[in-house]
Amino acid sequence: MPVDPILRQAISEVTTALARVAATESLGRYAEALVAATAAVDAARATGHTPVIAEALARRGDLELRLSRFDEA
């Protein structure tokens, strides 16, 4: 985890958003979860922190597969 407190906060916010995405997905609200996951990917990319970017991309890819969006996944 980075030392910079602002970056740590941004990463924490992305992680929290991804937890919400997972909860939404578990309720079967896949399209809604995909929208939130896409926003999380954008937020993760803004941090520049590779592990959180990878986590967000993986979550979004899983949702795209679940919604049969194979080209996007």
Question: Where do the model's predicted regions map?
Answer:
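TPR-repeat structural position
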Residues: 30, 50, 70-71
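Structural signature of alpha-solenoid helical repeat scaffolds
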Residues: 8-9, 48
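Amphipathic alpha-helical segments of tetratricopeptide repeats
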Residues: 38-49
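Tetratricopeptide repeat
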Residues: 33, 39-40, 73
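Residue register of alpha-helical TPR repeats
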Residues: 13-15, 55-57
